Amino acid sequence: MKNNEYKYGGVLMTKPYYNKNKMILVHSDTFKFLSKMKPESMDMIFADPPYFLSNGGISNSGGQVVSVDKGDWDKISSFEEKHEFNRKWIRLAKEVLKPNGTVWISGSLHNIYSVGMALEQEGFKILNNITWQKTNPAPNLSCRYFTHSTETILWARKNDKKARHYYNYDLMKELNDGKQMKDVWTGSLTKKVEKWAGKHPTQKPEYLLERIILASTKEGDYILDPFVGSGTTGVVAKRLGRRFIGIDAEKEYLKIARKRLEAENETN
């Protein structure tokens, strides 16, 4: 092993951006890092990949008209390029996922259909099509179509008859007043109190990741987020006693994620 390489749970990596209490952040191109990871080493993957919305449009934020351009990482020139991007990272993610592991992928109408197709093309079986119904979506400024108030989260496992994915049915039922948990989840956008460490354009609320992690992992499991952004997956993973690796190519977002993980380490 070279001087600048580390081992984490059997996963070979270069020196991490952050490494404390089994919480790892890596500054890297996702494709490059995934290709170096140990095969079948992760119990669960949560991904919120680029939505490819940055096309010069406008949206609403706090009553103000704002650009939807999020950065070069969210721009793409064609559907073919978008779909190849999704197929490539999903193919690499499959290699590092354990035989009984699962992957969750969040998206909007702008990319989720490509994601769903890519999952099936790369040998996954989709288990659920979760609809996240937002109680306080941004208003529709154009008034030319229905207000976008939902996002989709696909849950999938490898398309292998021998695969036995984990689902904590009893806990989900308990959290839903003794009734079976349905595939429509209702809740607010990310609260301001969760955005204290800095701004990220697509930060997910902690309650969403809490349900996902509790439903599909056990304490001590390895969770990977290949587009970690502001670090919500890692924060909730730490809180729930899971081990975590997060990857991002943008240092400005890793700084936010590190602040949040440091705060979580101090309190838990």
Curated annotation (Swiss-Prot):
Keyword Magnesium in record: no
Alphabetically ordered keywords of this record: DNA-binding, Methyltransferase, Restriction system, S-adenosyl-L-methionine, Transferase
CDD domains assigned to the protein according to its UniProt record, in alphabetical order: AdoMet_MTases (cd02440)
Any GO molecular function: site-specific DNA-methyltransferase (adenine-specific) activity
Catalyzed reactions: a 2'-deoxyadenosine in DNA + S-adenosyl-L-methionine = an N(6)-methyl-2'-deoxyadenosine in DNA + S-adenosyl-L-homocysteine + H(+)
Domain of life: Bacteria
Annotated GO biological process: DNA restriction-modification system; methylation
Pfam families in the cross-refs: N6_N4_Mtase
EC number from the UniProt entry: 2.1.1.72
GO cellular component, one term: cytoplasm
Function, as annotated: Further methylates DNA that is already methylated at 5'-GATC-3' sites. Essential for establishment of a previously unmethylated plasmid transformed into the cell as single-stranded DNA, enhances plasmid transfer to DpnII-containing strains of Streptococcus pneumoniae.
Family: Belongs to the N(4)/N(6)-methyltransferase family.
Other remarks on this protein: The DpnII restriction system has two different methylases.
Subunit-structure text: Homodimer.
Name the record gives this protein: Type II methyltransferase M2.DpnII
Species annotation: Streptococcus pneumoniae
